[in-house]
Amino acid sequence: MDQFVITSLREYAERYETETFLFEDPSLFMHKVQGERNQEIIAFIAAGLSYGRRELFFPKIQYVIDCSHGDVEKWILSNDFCKDIPDNNKCYYRLYTNKIINTFIKRIKSMLEEYGSLRQFAISNTKEKDAVTLVEAFTKFFNENEASHVIPKETKSSCKRLCMFLRWMVRTSSPVN
């Protein structure tokens, strides 16, 4: 890597790897709930909804936290989410209907029931510690029977939001993640 790139990356890190940046970043939501599983789940939902203008999608993520009273895992496993995000065609956010988000959350529920947590799913699907294999596993799981429009159908796209979630989950020394 040349010196310009190294210097630029360090400058960006100094600018954006701060607690003040957190208030403008979707990773904020995983700091609003307690417990590793709740943090993983809300981070995954936040990443899935993170496109467009923040002032529009932030309230949709906050709605999940409010409805679940901060216990997103219990809210999902108890099917309480079906009352708050019914299986209908009303718009939830931009191109996503309630039905799309409801189906997305049902797939999260299936993952929790089968693996116990998103982390355990990741561990079970990364034998070589290969990020591409993990992204493929997530896309496959969430698109069985064409169940989800939130997670890309395949890895031919950049899978930007899914990769953002994975970055949040592996970084431990960042004040943002």
Where does each model-flagged region fall?
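HhH-family (HhH-GPD) DNA N-glycosylase catalytic core used in base-excision repair
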Residues: 1-177
